[in-house]
Amino acid sequence: MTHDYIVRGLAYGGEIRAYAAITTESVQEAQTRHYTWPTASAAMGRTMTATVMMGAMLKGNQKLTVTVDGKGPIGRIIADADAQGNVRAYVDHPQTHFPLNDQGKLDVRRAVGTDGSIQVVKDVGMKDYFSGASPIVSGELGDDFTYYYATSEQTPSSVGLGVLVNPDNSIKAAGGFIIQVMPGATDETVTKLEEAISQMQPVSKLIEQGLTPEGILNEILGEGNVQILNSTSAQFECNCSHEKFLNAIKGLGEAEIHSMIKEDHGAEAVCHFCGNKYQYSESELEDLLETMK
């Protein structure tokens, strides 16, 4: 099985910027950790795929967080990624599932809802943040990220996202693409791109056929039209730690920590993103109080 990775490329003489990713293993890791049911897995996996490709557009230590909140039964989907291909995600209600929709596909729109927004916060370093948001227009997510780029970042784009789930709830395949029109692109190039996208198979079909990220871009943009610039491995990775949660407990204040010691004789923290649990003993909390004096 091919490991997850993202490719970045140019097409049509540099007038098109393109990203594609296979994210099957990363989405599987998230599914296992959160025990998501199929519709939730598809929604979470599509969001992870978009987020990890958006991360590939960053540099150095920059990172971003994407929050999808369509006010649907799944609640919020939160994913973050960095420039190194690390991605993690969780959903408020992982056991969300519905019968297949009219097209015989997982009903992601029903789970996500259509009465909310996508918010993107980019940490670009030096305590500098870029924040953008756009309304959810479809709930299927690919169209919603396309709309986000057009309205919030003024970049005409096409975003395709697909997740296939096996009958046993495991992830069969996951992946997607982001194709963007660069400033100065000719009308001819834009027309060619629109035609190519209108004629392409759904992303889920491309990944089901076992296409690589390079194969996805070649399939959409045509063999020989794509110049691959680089590739980055992608993986589910959580940077939580015992120390980070201890700092978070410190932020609750002395009164709350005294209460933890007196009533609970310790504390437990659970990471939303990966499900890891961290235990803090009475003595550890008492030591923490000492450092706060």
Curated annotation (Swiss-Prot):
InterPro entries: Heat_shock_Hsp33 (IPR000397), Heat_shock_Hsp33_C (IPR016154), Heat_shock_Hsp33_N (IPR016153). SUPFAM superfamilies: Hsp33 domain, HSP33 redox switch-like. Disulfide bonds join C238-C240, C271-C274. It is found in: Cytoplasm. Under oxidizing conditions two disulfide bonds are formed involving the reactive cysteines. Under reducing conditions zinc is bound to the reactive cysteines and the protein is inactive. It comes from the Bacteria. GO terms for biological process: protein refolding. Keywords: Chaperone, Cytoplasm, Disulfide bond, Redox-active center, Zinc. One of its GO terms (molecular function) is unfolded protein binding. Coiled coil: none annotated. GO terms for cellular component: cytoplasm. Belongs to the HSP33 family. NCBIfam families: PRK00114.1 (NF001033). Redox regulated molecular chaperone. Protects both thermally unfolding and oxidatively damaged proteins from irreversible aggregation. Plays an important role in the bacterial defense system toward oxidative stress. This is 33 kDa chaperonin. It comes from Staphylococcus epidermidis (strain ATCC 35984 / DSM 28319 / BCRC 17069 / CCUG 31568 / BM 3577 / RP62A).
